[in-house]
Amino acid sequence: MKLRDESDIPIVGFDIAGSEWGHPADELKQSYDYAHQHFLHKTVHAGEASGPESIFSAVTSCHADRIGHGLQLFREDKIIDPLIDDKKLYISRLANFLADSRITVEVCLTSNLQTMPELKSIKEHSLSKMLDKRLSVSICTDNRLVSNTSVCKELKLMTDNFNLTEKLFKDIVVYGFKRSFFYGSYSDKRKYVGKCISYYESI
């Protein structure tokens, strides 16, 4: 926060990434609370390897504005808390909360194929369910170098494997800008997003 407030470095958000197993996001609740109380955007690596509870922790303990991956959101078999009796209802309510709150899921198709051997085909990815539930989704690379990909490659992979209308494709692209962590005022961000949409519509 000191660096953000006392320098010209455009610090826009706080993130946690790494292995989820044995390292739940809520262990960093104090850090996320601090970021939240100082008006910094927050994203959390959740639901890549661990299940829906990891995403629940990200939004309830860490005030996540965005979720990195979210792949396992709909996996009932990944729920480990014995006190959760109705797993289907738990997932339904969690997905509805994400959709209603417009918490954006950063979907990383190529990376998930590379790191999750249980994902045999991109068509098995939970992206289609996310879209069915009207979640705010953006297409991301996770990393360009290790995964040897780009946003354009990821968008093509999506269009080649999922049945998208032109409107839905545009919505996904636009969500990436609307839900970005922008360095500047909300008014400036609206102007920026407007320019992005105008450019999209011109090509």
Q: Model-flagged regions — what are they?
A:
Residues 111-116, 138-140, 156-161:
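Short beta-alpha connecting loops at secondary-structure transitions
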Residues 124-141, 196-203:
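Surface-exposed, interaction-prone regions with an acidic/low-complexity signature
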Residues 1-13, 21-65, 79-103, 121-135, ...:
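Histidine/acidic residue-rich metal-binding segments in metalloenzymes
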Residues 18-24, 48-50, 73-75, 112-117, ...:
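Short, small-residue-enriched loops and turns at beta-alpha junctions
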Residues 43-49, 109, 135-152:
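Short acidic/histidine-rich active-site segments
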Residues 66-78, 145, 183:
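Glycine-rich phosphate-binding active-site loops on the catalytic face of alpha/beta enzymes
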Residues 153, 157, 163-203:
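Mid-to-C-terminal alpha-helical segments outside catalytic/metal-binding sites
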